[in-house]
Amino acid sequence: MEISIPDEGMTVADALNADAGPIVVYGQLFDDGQGLRLCSGLTRSLPPICVGEPLLVDGLALVGVALEDHEGTMWSTDAVVLEGVIDGDTLRDSRVR
C-alpha cells in the first residue's frame, strides 16, 4: 500500500539508526497481535504485512487514529507522524503529532 509522505519526520529506517533521544518519525501502524509497530509501508495483501524492519511503538494511545481490522490484524491506512523517544528499536512515550 502506497502512502503519501509527510513533510515532517524521518523514515522508520532512519529512526532505527538514530541515536537515543527525542525524534519525529512517520510510517504506517501495524499490529498482528505481536505488539504495535511502525512500518515503512505495508503489502497490498489482506491482511497486510509490514514492509522492512519495523519500529516497536510503546505507550501510544490510538485515539483518533483511523485503523482497519481484518482477522485480528490492525493497521493504519494512512501514514501517521509520531513523536517520542527512540531507544534502540523502540519508540517510547510516543504520541501522534
Regions found by a protein language model. Give the residues of each.
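OB-fold and OB-like single-stranded nucleic-acid-recognition modules
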Residues: M1-R97
